[in-house]
């Protein structure tokens, strides 16, 4: 067994023993030592959220890939969860084909920036055919094209203290992911689906594609990305609007 795997096994075993023998406080301290505390670590299910997140990060490579499919496997139907944003701003942008839309990127970056849709399309892109699994029980396979989030973040200069990327859409929803997922090669800012412009119901003009996590983490209608060292001062401090509604912050599949 390699030194890395021995260390991972030791930490995972210690977390489990701490959870069983001494409860939440000891397990939380141990996970915190290795930077493995998720934002939703408090409350009745906090220890479970912490152990799930910590075990995944310890035992799996940050670059393990979600399965990619062939074009022949693309689903004929791609269901949609939720409605279009009803705000005047979104409706105006939609009717102008997002000509005046911009994605702002700020926070713990060296060069805060903003990008038009056309500017994003001129950046290096990635196309992948992956599964979108919704928390409502359905799924579909689609082809997605967009800018790798890791490329965009590196282009603006991530500062060393950065821990999370917060994603704000053109509606009241928001989500956050850790740097491991933000820098993963399959994490995209997608502007196209199945070879066409991203349809509005699927998140136009830009959505997150995070194929290693469940559907609600794949934020649609993006307008703002903020790099932070903590999410405690955003919303209720638990890492996302879905978490505030009772979902897990880490939703790996």
Which ranges hold each PLM region?
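N-terminal secretory signal peptides and thylakoid transit peptides that target proteins
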Residues: 1-18
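A general, composition-driven signal for non-globular sequence regions
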Residues: 1-2, 23, 51
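Generic low-polarity alpha-helical segments
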Residues: 10-11, 23, 111
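Hydrophobic alpha-helical membrane-insertion segments, chiefly the h-region
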Residues: 20-29
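Structured, non-membrane catalytic/scaffold regions adjacent to prosthetic-group chemistry
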Residues: 28-253
């Amino acid at each position: 067994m390699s030194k890395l795997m021995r260390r991972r096994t030791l930490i995972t075993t210690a977390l489990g023993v701490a959870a069983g023998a001494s409860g939440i406080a000891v397990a939380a301290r141990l996970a915190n030592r290795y930077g493995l505390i998720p934002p939703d670590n408090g409350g009745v299910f906090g220890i479970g959220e912490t152990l799930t997140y910590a075990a995944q990060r310890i035992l799996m490579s940050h670059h393990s890939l979600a399965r990619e499919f062939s074009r022949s496997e693309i689903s004929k139907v791609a269901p949609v969860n939720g409605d279009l944003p009803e705000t005047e701003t979104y409706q105006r942008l939609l009717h102008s084909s997002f000509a005046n839309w911009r994605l702002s990127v700020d926070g713990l970056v060296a060069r805060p920036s903003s990008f038009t849709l056309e500017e994003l399309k001129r950046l290096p892109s990635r196309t992948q055919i992956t599964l979108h699994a919704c928390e409502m029980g359905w799924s579909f396979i689609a082809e997605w094209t967009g800018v790798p989030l890791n490329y965009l973040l590196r282009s603006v200069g991530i500062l060393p203290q950065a821990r999370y990327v917060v994603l704000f859409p053109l509606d009241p929803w928001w989500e956050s992911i850790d740097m491991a997922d933000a820098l993963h090669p399959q994490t995209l800012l997608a502007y196209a689906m199945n070879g066409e412009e991203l349809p509005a119901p699927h998140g136009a003009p830009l959505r997150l594609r995070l194929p290693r996590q469940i559907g609600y983490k794949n934020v649609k209608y993006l307008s703002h990305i903020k790099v932070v060292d903590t999410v405690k001062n955003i919303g209720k401090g638990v890492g996302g609007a879905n978490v505030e509604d009772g979902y897990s912050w880490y939703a790996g599949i």
